[in-house]
Amino acid sequence: MLYTRLLRHNSQFTKFSGTSPNLGSKPLFSKGNLYTSLLVTTLYGTGLACLYLESNSLNKSKEQEDPHAIAEDDIVNIVHDAPNRIFKPALDTYQEKELDLQKSDLHKVLHSLTYSDVSQFSIVWGFLIQLSSLIGNSTLGKKSILYKGSVVSVLGFPPLIYMALKLRMKQLEKAGVRFE
């Protein structure tokens, strides 16, 4: 009833006006938004895949271990021989171990990563990128100080994580752990 009254009183109303496309409107998704969404989805997927690999590697190591109690001296060996590390140690000879001591910090940090490290890094970085994109596409716009700050946080996150992982690696090396 109300609908028919609106039809009678509104002379500008035409049939199917709600479904006809407005050709002058701007598309909702630009290429930048598409690439940002693709990057965020990829980072989230990487994080979930690494969580799955972490779970599988730890479950396999628990099945292979003896159920003996762990002594305090064994803790360093467990960290050193962690089954969830991405790059497994493959050094056998003394010369290769000497070459390992001469490698850069970046190489050592990458070889000390576990699946959980990569998972946490990728999920948090994806969240920061998604948040930055959301702020840029909102009413605040890309010229706002909040958007510029979020872009700085997105770009500054990987170096910050590298420094934190490097500090962790140095502390573990002081405790006697060698990263091969």
Swiss-Prot record:
Gene Ontology cellular-component terms listed: mitochondrial membrane; mitochondrion
Entry keyword Transcription regulation: no
Alphabetic keyword roster: Membrane, Mitochondrion, Transmembrane, Transmembrane helix
Predominant cellular place of this UniProt entry's protein: mitochondrion
Induction statement: By cell wall perturbation.
Top-level taxon of origin: Eukaryota
Transmembrane parts of this sequence: 34-54, 121-141, 145-165
Protein topology in the membrane: Multi-pass membrane protein
Claim: Lyase is one of the keywords in the record: no
Subcellular location: Mitochondrion membrane
Protein name: Mitochondrial membrane protein FMP33
